[in-house]
Amino acid sequence: MKLHLASGNLHKAEEFAVLAAASARDDAPAIEIVSARAMGGMPEVVEDTGTFVGNARKKAAALRVRLPAGSWVLADDSGVCVDALHGGPGVESAYYAGPEASGRANYEKLLRVLADVPDERRGAYFFCLLLVLDGAGAEYVFEGRCQGRLLREPRGSAGFGYDPIFVPDGFDRSYAELGEDVKNRISHRARAWAQLAEWGRRS
């Protein structure tokens, strides 16, 4: 199965490639991830639907029109949902500090907003929604989440986005400190991918 990734985020492309390789089995067809960069780049998409599934659907549709008929597309929309912010920034996580904001700018803004929130109220979870468009245009949706808490300052140099300030439940290190191997076993994206991979083996 070849999935064309509807994302211009190089970090996501690398993460999906690792997840696909890790989920490969001898008794099932391999899943190949083709990055948008390999297809001339990802078209610009305004993520304005207000929902994870709506944004993923827009991204998938934008890339699909550039591909040969019958191509399969994978779109991802994800974010960090903070208890003290009633689930925010959520679907707006990628541009929390502005439309061109970096991952660092986004998490620094979040830390400022939460500056007066005590440790016991800094619960949060990462959420990932994966949407597959098959060759006939049918949609398949997979979801994953990872519960945890937010730090008061960034820790670690690996990962991207909000990784340096998020500590998953059961650990005392941030996503950015845990390293790729651990993160790709427990993350929100890994959990959504596990569902997708299992579906792919059954299809």
UniProtKB/Swiss-Prot annotation:
EC number annotated for this UniProt entry: 3.6.1.66
Keyword Signal: no
Chain positions recorded as substrate binding sites: 7-12, 78, 160-163, 183, 188-189
Residue numbers annotated as active site: 77 (proton acceptor)
Swiss-Prot/TrEMBL GO biological process terms: nucleotide metabolic process; purine nucleoside triphosphate catabolic process
General function of this protein: Pyrophosphatase that catalyzes the hydrolysis of nucleoside triphosphates to their monophosphate derivatives, with a high preference for the non-canonical purine nucleotides XTP (xanthosine triphosphate), dITP (deoxyinosine triphosphate) and ITP. Seems to function as a house-cleaning enzyme that removes non-canonical purine nucleotides from the nucleotide pool, thus preventing their incorporation into DNA/RNA and avoiding chromosomal lesions.
Complex and partners: Homodimer.
Designated name of the protein: dITP/XTP pyrophosphatase
Organism: Opitutus terrae (strain DSM 11246 / JCM 15787 / PB90-1)
